[in-house]
């Protein structure tokens, strides 16, 4: 062992050793319990950033800790490798997406290994590899056979910059979540997964996720958006057509004074044909259709009268039909009944267009609401009025009564509605999983047979965005034979949303080299579900919801034995610098490579883990990094000075009664074992765990420096030093490995059993208590531990120093707090 801490030499040495010895390869089956620790896999952009370092360092501590606790830990890593950035980079640099992606993977893999992460690299996956996306195509076919996959002509979100369709979940405030371009609306034939079939199960099973943050569950609950109400049918006057609306307030149906349709509602053209309002309505529709959803829902509410009426099925009233910008066709039924007296938006719209207002709910039977006095809609509960047979009913009871009446009369029904829409998976881009479908004039839409998978993604493609799939430009890909009749056919040229790839990768890790199955069910049964999942809260809806959906589908297909993929979820905070998220545009990016080169991977890990609790944002601090580096140097110097004593030390005696400084050293050691174990295994309070290790190191320095070498108990000293190294191992694996070897131990420190504390060693002989006079601390004194209140009071009051503090003052009251303080109230 060198006197100087040469982190570069040490980290290189042990990384090579771990790689050579396959230290982190885990067997699929053994007698040990299993633990599956997984961090969300990265997109191979080419460079790690500090957010990656934080995410993977957190996971690595958990994985190493669980391994030392006696678990077989599955801790894999892979690459979410398909997607638009590869195409955009390829266009910019004139390099094929595959070449760019694989080069980036090689570089980032090297960076991850430099961090000393305990991944089983034998399980590595890349979603762009044929042996991965072959099984993605196979899973598509399973959903297709189950009726959960379909194609339809749909109005979709279109990103003009990315030149592709976006799922609803990928549109944030009317903009593309990836490039921030304003999203447009477009009509296209698209493939969908029927996630709505699982809406209620996805909602119900949120209660099973006790290890998930509440905020994530609330976000999913709101996105699924369950609402109970009724579908009511209004007949169009003078027509066989009808309009169906969904409402959560059927108790207000007698207050309907107008009907509003979405501009893209298919009934609009029929309603206005030949009417005087036709030209005006067409102009309005064309103008609104150019707007984004955000513009439509956030701007002023605008509408236009169609000239048509429908009939309220409850009271026969004529209801004017309007078109409005704020009604979206893909939400609900694309039609909304206007009840201005009891809905604020409807109230404002009615005032703007001088539409009638009908009050049908009073606060109480004797509290009338006059329309001319209304300044806003009355939206609270009350008593139904002007509502025919329902007059006098409390409106909450009225909801059930109206639904029952509607069902009996055949004019409506009770229904549960969801905000969630089916998952749009088609993308008009090249770098993605080809959809395994062919189109035959004779046979129609035909799935590719499983034995013909994978449908290989061609490498020589002109992939510049044109609005059509680049694969259309490869005739040798497009033109094929029909699997059913053998006649000419054409392949589907859209590729799948990359979220399809990332919604099942956690299962592929369980048998990533399997060529016969997407995963070996026996292995999946052993490892699933993921015990600890770690990633950013930005994935709360998209990735996590889709993964939950896939797992439930796979359960129904008999492919897995679990219905939820992730038992526990940790959403780590961001890494900030100068109060802002690191970004090139702000010039505040800190390179992990530079930090590792200057201070070492162990220092980078220690700072990241010590600076803030995992779920909180972390403010980057150069001084904090230097402080972590100084601490590791301090540990190194301590062990270097004691290595010979530690290496030849006897074991702790079970019969020896340790007293004085030796007992205190043992107490510090076992307190650290207890505290670090609690912090790491509980809420992942790594910052306080590291702080406790620092306190233990201080205690060992004190023991070394204040106790002469001949008087030191080498068994106590060795216990303290060895414990420090083991406790440090999950956080700073390289230095811990080197120190373990230097103190005479065989084998890897990471294969050592985790420590258990000795409760007897935690018992203190003395405790320090504060003596207060009128609430102010005047003295701190050591007294025997575990004294009862009366004993402590008498012991302290008999001490000369306390008598001097009281002097000739009159004692009014004495308040003893055992083991902590004695407050003496005097006057």
UniProtKB/Swiss-Prot annotation:
Motif, 'KMSKS' region: chain positions: 581-585
Enzymatic class: ligase
Annotated ATP binding sites: 584
EC number per UniProt: 6.1.1.4
Alphabetized PROSITE patterns for the sequence: AA_TRNA_LIGASE_I
UniProt keyword annotations, A-Z: Aminoacyl-tRNA synthetase, ATP-binding, Cytoplasm, Ligase, Nucleotide-binding, Protein biosynthesis
An example Gene Ontology CC term for this record: cytosol
Location(s) in or outside the cell: Cytoplasm
Keyword Ligase: yes
Reactions listed under catalytic activity: tRNA(Leu) + L-leucine + ATP = L-leucyl-tRNA(Leu) + AMP + diphosphate
GO molecular function annotations of the record: aminoacyl-tRNA deacylase activity; ATP binding; leucine-tRNA ligase activity
Ranges spanned by the short sequence motif 'HIGH' region, renumbered to the chain: 42-52
Name this protein carries in UniProt: Leucine--tRNA ligase
């Amino acid at each position: 062992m060198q006197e100087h801490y040469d982190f570069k030499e040490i980290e290189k040495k042990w990384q090579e050793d771990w790689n050579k010895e396959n230290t982190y390869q885990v067997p699929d089956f053994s007698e040990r319990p299993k633990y599956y620790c997984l961090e969300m896999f990265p997109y191979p952009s080419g460079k790690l950033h500090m957010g990656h370092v934080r995410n993977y360092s957190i996971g690595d501590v958990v994985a190493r800790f669980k391994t030392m606790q006696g678990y077989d830990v599955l801790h894999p890593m892979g690459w979410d490798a398909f997607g638009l950035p590869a195409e955009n980079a390829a266009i910019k640099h004139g390099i094929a997406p595959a070449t760019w992606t694989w080069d980036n993977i090689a570089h980032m893999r090297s960076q991850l290994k430099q961090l000393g992460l305990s991944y089983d690299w034998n399980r590595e996956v890349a979603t762009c590899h044929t042996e991965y996306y072959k099984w993605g195509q196979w899973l598509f076919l399973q959903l297709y056979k189950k009726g959960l996959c379909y194609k339809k002509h749909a109005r979709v979100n279109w990103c003009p910059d990315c030149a592709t369709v976006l799922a609803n979940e990928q549109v944030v405030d009317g903009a593309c979540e990836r490039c921030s371009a304003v999203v447009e609306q477009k009509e296209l034939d698209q493939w969908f997964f029927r996630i709505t079939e699982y809406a209620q199960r996805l909602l119900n099973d949120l209660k099973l996720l006790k290890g998930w943050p509440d905020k994530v569950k609330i976000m999913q609950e709101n996105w699924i958006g369950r609402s109970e109400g009724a579908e009511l049918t209004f007949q169009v006057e003078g027509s066989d057509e009808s309009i169906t609306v969904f409402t959560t307030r059927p108790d207000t149906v007698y207050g309907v004074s107008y009907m509003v349709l979405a501009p893209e509602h298919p009934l609009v053209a029929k309603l206005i044909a030949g009417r005087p309002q036709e030209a005006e309505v067409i102009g309005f529709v064309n103008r609104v259709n150019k707007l984004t959803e955000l513009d439509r829902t956030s701007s002023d509410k605008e509408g236009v009268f169609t000239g048509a009426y429908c009939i309220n099925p409850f009271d026969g009233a004529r209801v004017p039909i309007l078109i409005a910008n704020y009604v979206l066709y893909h939400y609900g039924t694309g039609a909304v009944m206007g009840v201005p007296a009891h809905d604020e938006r409807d109230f404002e719209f009615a005032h703007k267009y001088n539409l009638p207002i009908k009050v049908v709910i009073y606060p109480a039977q004797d509290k009338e609401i006059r329309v001319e006095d209304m300044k806003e809609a009355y939206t609270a509960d009350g008593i139904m009025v002007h509502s025919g047979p329902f007059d006098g009913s409390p409106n909450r009871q009225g909801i059930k009564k109206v639904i029952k009446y509607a069902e009996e009369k055949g004019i409506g029904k009770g229904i549960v509605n969801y905000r969630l829409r089916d998952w749009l998976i088609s993308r008009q881009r090249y770098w993605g999983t080809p959809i395994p479908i062919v189109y035959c004039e004779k046979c129609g839409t035909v799935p590719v047979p499983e034995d013909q998978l994978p449908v290989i993604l061609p490498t020589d493609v002109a992939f510049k965005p044109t609005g059509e799939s680049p694969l259309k430009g490869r005739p040798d890909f497009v033109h094929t034979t029909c699997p059913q009749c053998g006649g000419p056919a054409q392949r589907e040229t859209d590729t799948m949303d990359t979220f399809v790839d990332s919604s099942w990768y956690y299962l592929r890790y369980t048998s990533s080299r399997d060529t016969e199955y997407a995963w070996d069910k026996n292995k999946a049964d052993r490892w699933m579900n993921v015990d600890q999942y770690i990633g950013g809260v930005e994935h709360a809806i998209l990735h996590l919801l889709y993964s939950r959906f896939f797992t439930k589908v796979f359960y129904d297909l008999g492919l897995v034995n679990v219905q939820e993929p992730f038992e526990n979820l940790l959403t780590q905070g961001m890494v900030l610098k100068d109060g802002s998220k690191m970004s090139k545009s702000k010039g505040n990016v800190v390179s992990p490579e530079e930090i590792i080169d200057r201070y070492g991977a162990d220092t980078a890990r220690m700072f990241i883990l010590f600076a803030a609790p995992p779920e909180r944002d972390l403010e980057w601090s150069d001084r904090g990094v230097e402080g972590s580096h100084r601490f590791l140097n301090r540990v190194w110097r301590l062990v270097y000075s004691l290595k010979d004593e530690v290496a030849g030390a006897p074991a702790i005696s079970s019969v020896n009664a340790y007293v004085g400084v030796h007992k205190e050293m043992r107490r510090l050691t076992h307190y650290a074992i207890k505290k670090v174990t609690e912090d790491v295994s509980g809420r992942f309070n790594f910052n306080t765990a590291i702080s406790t290790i620092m306190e233990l190191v201080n205690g060992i320095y004190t023991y070394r420096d204040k106790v002469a070498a001949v008087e030191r108990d080498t068994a106590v000293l060795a216990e303290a030093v060895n414990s420090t190294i083991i406790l440090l191992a999950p956080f700073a694996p390289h230095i811990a490995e080197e120190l373990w070897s230097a103190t005479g131990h065989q084998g890897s420190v990471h294969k050592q059993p985790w420590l258990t504390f000795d409760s007897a060693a935690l018992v203190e002989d003395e405790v320090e208590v504060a003596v207060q006079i009128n609430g102010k601390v005047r003295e701190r004194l050591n007294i025997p531990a575990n004294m009862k209140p009366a004993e402590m009071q008498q012991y302290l009051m008999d001490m000369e120093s306390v008598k001097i503090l009281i002097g000739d003052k009159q004692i009014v009251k004495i308040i003893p707090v055992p083991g902590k303080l004695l407050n003496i109230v005097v006057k």
